[in-house]
Every structure is written in structure tokens, then in C-alpha cells.
């Protein structure tokens, strides 16, 4: 039985967007173990994904931290991966290909280019179009890449809703990734006040923070 590695860091939205591709990869390697290399924030969430046989933590420490990179290399080498599917396609994962994972067959944006095609042109396409082309180039049968099914991630929160709402509510996601704080809209507190005024508190306003956003969420 061979081992297959998928690399996906990014944000939660990026991982959700890649979920269909992960399913297609698993379906194409049914007799192999498929593992995901990802960030700490998504270990618990992706550990429940039925298309994965395991999740490996990448602390994503600076590349000058040779002790960490050496430990990560030793860990990855233990799995003896036959294929790597780089769905992140970042400078970091290019570095991993060059120095940490030289032996496996590698699938990335760069390996998916047609003769004469420039990477800059390839990157102008939508994320899912790029992933689909990448997987097709690696002979993956495409069925779910653009038909993402997240039923496995649904949780029963009826008890929470009964505690904080009367059945109807307004849910707000006011946060963004730490790397791109410039994308965060600064007027959510004012918006919440306006919503309460407009609906005269008819609908409770709920916020869905991440683990590091709870204190800030309470201030809203």
C-alpha cells in the first residue's frame, strides 16, 4: 500500500474549496493512504474528513529554522510517499519539493503547464479551474472538485441555538486570516448596532469566531 500526500495550508476557506479535490484524489487512490499536510488551526477539522487517512502538522516555521525543517523532512520520509499533490502552490511548497520531498511524483501548478504556457497565465484562471487542470494532468478522475460536499462537517448545534435564539437569528462572520488583516472590514460593530436598531432586537445577532478571535468577538 502506497502513501499519498496532499499539501494545503491557506485559510479555512481555501481548505473547504479544496475538499472536492481531496475527495477525487482519494477516489483515485482507493488502495492507498491519503494524508494531508496542513496548519495547526485546521488539524482537528480536517481530521474528521472521511477522504483522508491522517493529517500531519506543519508548523510553517521560517525556512531558516533548519532544525525544524530537518525534523519535518525526517517525519515525511517515514511515510515514503509515492505522490505529492501540492494544492497550495506557494514558495514554501516549492521549497519543500526541492529540499524535503525529492523522490515522490509531484503534482503542482508548474507540472500542469502545457508546452509554451506561462505560469503567470495559468494563475489567472480561477482556483478551482487550476486545481481541476492540475488533477487531470495527474490522471485523477474529476467528479467532485467543483461539486464540494461538506455534509461530513455538519454539527448539531440545536442546543446552542435554543439557548441564544428563538429560532431565527442573524449570523455574522467579521474576521479574516491573520496574514491578510487588511481585508477585514472595520465597521462590523457599527453594523451590529444598526441591525439591532433596525429590527428592534427581533433577531439575535450571533458571531462565529475562531479560537483566537473569541475575546474580540465578545467586544462586539
Give the role of each language-model region.
Residues 1-220:
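Catalytic machinery of carbohydrate-active enzymes
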Amino acid at each position: 500500500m502506497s502513501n499519498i500526500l496532499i499539501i494545503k495550508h491557506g485559510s479555512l476557506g481555501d481548505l473547504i474549496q479544496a475538499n472536492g479535490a481531496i475527495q477525487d484524489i482519494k477516489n483515485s487512490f482507493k488502495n492507498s493512504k491519503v494524508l494531508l499536510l496542513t496548519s495547526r488551526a485546521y488539524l482537528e477539522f480536517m481530521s474528521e474528513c472521511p477522504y483522508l487517512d491522517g493529517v500531519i502538522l506543519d508548523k510553517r516555521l521560517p525556512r531558516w529554522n533548519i532544525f525544524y525543517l530537518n525534523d519535518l523532512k525526517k517525519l515525511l520520509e517515514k511515510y515514503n510517499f509515492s505522490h505529492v499533490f501540492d494544492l497550495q502552490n506557494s514558495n514554501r511548497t516549492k521549497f519543500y519539493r526541492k529540499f524535503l520531498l525529492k523522490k515522490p511524483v509531484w503534482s503542482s501548478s508548474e507540472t500542469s503547464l502545457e508546452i509554451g504556457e506561462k505560469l503567470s497565465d495559468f494563475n489567472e484562471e480561477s482556483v478551482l479551474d487550476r486545481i481541476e487542470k492540475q488533477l487531470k494532468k495527474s490522471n485523477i478522475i474529476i467528479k467532485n472538485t467543483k461539486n464540494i460536499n461538506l455534509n461530513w462537517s455538519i454539527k448539531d448545534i440545536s442546543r446552542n441555538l435554543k439557548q441564544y435564539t428563538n429560532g431565527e437569528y442573524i449570523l455574522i462572520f467579521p474576521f479574516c486570516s491573520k496574514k491578510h488583516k487588511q481585508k477585514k472590514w472595520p465597521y462590523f460593530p457599527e453594523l451590529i448596532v444598526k441591525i439591532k436598531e433596525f429590527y428592534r432586537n427581533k433577531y439575535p445577532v450571533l458571531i462565529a469566531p475562531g479560537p483566537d478571535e473569541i475575546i474580540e468577538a465578545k467586544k462586539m
